[in-house]
Amino acid sequence: MRIILGIYSILFVICSISVAQTENEHASLMSLVQTERAFARTSVAKGIRESFLAFFADDGIVFRPHPVRYKETVANTPPPTNPLAVTLNWEPLFADVARSGDLGYTTGPYTLTDNSPEKRQPQHGFFFSVWKKQADGNWRVVLDAGIRTPELYSGPTKFQLAPRLVKESAESRLEPGEGKEMLLNAECELMEVAATDGFVKAFVAHISKDARVYRQGVQPVIGIDSVRAFLSKRPFTQSWKPMKAEVARSADLGYTYGSYEKKERGAAAAMEKGYYARVWKRDATGRWHVVFDVANPLPSNESE
């Protein structure tokens, strides 16, 4: 009887810890989404510049078109005379956060509206932001990118939470520093397989079943079958060089960004150059999967 009671006590403790971790993770995710929405409200009320300065980390990166630190870039730039001449508004539709609650990302549709006398047509697209919890406990953007789409998004508007891929276990825990090394190894493995098997085959083999791929001029491509079909439309090869990788304390979520070069199959010259950003997520077996990928091509005059 004592043995049975002991087993039940252990199971109760394990279940309690699991529930507490799930609740903490959900709370972190909701706080991230609330911060994203506050960011958007500030943008509409006070303008793009002021909102970005308020919600970006000091080392937060944007692509203009090369990666730069936003706060450093605008530090010596005079503020606009009318900060609301153009308004940027957005709404998160999808978000995920690491189990440790210190790193996450959000994405959703945006609209850029011209309020000047010219009243140019609104621009539409999808934003993507990586957030990191700072020492003061606040979420701040560490990387921001996006795509422009030809028309307003008309798909599902219900907010979605990312599916959980990692279960807390002794086998899935990593020592500090191991997560980043493993993530970079996964990125290198993807590059090696792409060099032999082709980018599309390699990429599809390394993504999650519900992965999201963002490319300029088209609506988001979601799901492994849709991604395979989209990338297979035109034969090409792709190479890339990671510039940075960062992983959550729990080592279940991380991101990379860097430069890429895209060529038509058999061609010597690149048909497109630019920068990519990629979110990776680790499953219960310890394997990393790409869950999000966005490309920011350089203007044609810079790609030559």
Can you say where each PLM-predicted feature lies in the sequence?
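Positively charged n-region of N-terminal signal peptides that target proteins for export
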Residues: 1-5
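Bacterial N-terminal signal peptides
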Residues: 6-16
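Short, low-complexity N-terminal intrinsically disordered segments enriched in polar/charged residues
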Residues: 19-50, 54-55, 150-201, 205, ...
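A solvent-exposed, acidic/Ser-Thr-rich amphipathic alpha-helical stretch
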Residues: 26-33, 47-102, 122, 200-251, ...
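Short, structured motif recognition centered on aromatic/hydrophobic residues
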Residues: 39-40, 90, 103-107, 128-131, ...
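Generic short beta-strand segments
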Residues: 58-59, 107-114, 257-263
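Hydrophobic/aromatic beta-strand elements that line small-molecule binding cavities or substrate pockets
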Residues: 76-78, 92-97, 110-112, 126-133, ...
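Short beta-strand edge/turn micro-motifs at domain boundaries
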Residues: 122-161, 273-299
